Regions:
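Hydrophobic ligand-binding cavity/cleft-lining segments
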Residues: 1-44
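Structural motif
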Residues: 3, 75, 104-108
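Hydrophobic/aromatic beta-strand elements that line small-molecule binding cavities or substrate pockets
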Residues: 6-8, 62-68, 90-98
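Short beta-strand-to-loop capping motifs
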Residues: 10-12, 56, 115
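Beta-strand/loop substructures that line and gate deep hydrophobic ligand-binding cavities in soluble
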Residues: 81-134
């Protein structure tokens, strides 16, 4: 099972970063690859089992389910039900931790999925550089005030 992983440091307190990324329906507010998001069936966005319909900037549609959300651990885990990517059984976790030296935040995003062997390397690069790093860069820019 291929795995993707990315991490970064955000120059902002962990509670502020968590507040920015916590909302399962709020991805368009901070990730440049997402045009809009809607929670299906009128559920609350922090309700385990909530399904979000994401519309990517290129018009593609993705559906994901919130599997776990912990304010104590500052983690969010979700899986992908539908999307244009050539993977299946996609499951990801986004987590933030405090860095006490300088009141900064360590952020990590990881995913595992199944894919055809010939597609694995390209999909890992896409998720690590396009999805994860794209999100980290946008968060850094936001908290830098740019």
């Amino acid at each position: 099972m291929p795995k993707g992983f990315g991490s970064s440091v955000i120059d902002a307190p962990v509670d502020e970063v968590w507040e920015r990324i916590r909302d399962f329906n709020g991805l368009p507010d901070w990730h440049p690859g997402i045009a809009r998001s809607e929670i299906e069936d009128g559920r609350a966005s922090d309700s385990i089992g909530a399904v979000r319909s994401l519309y990517l900037q290129d018009g593609e549609h993705v559906r994901e389910t919130l599997l776990a959300l912990s304010d104590l651990d500052r983690t969010q885990t979700y899986d992908m039900l539908k999307g244009p990517m050539a993977w299946w059984n996609y499951k990801a976790t986004l987590r933030v931790l405090p860095i006490t030296d300088g009141d900064r935040t360590y952020i990590e995003w990881s995913a595992e999925f199944d894919a055809k062997p010939e597609d694995e390397a390209g999909l890992i690069e896409f998720v690590e550089q396009g999805v994860f790093q794209g999100g980290f860069d946008a968060l850094k820019k936001h908290f830098a005030g740019n």
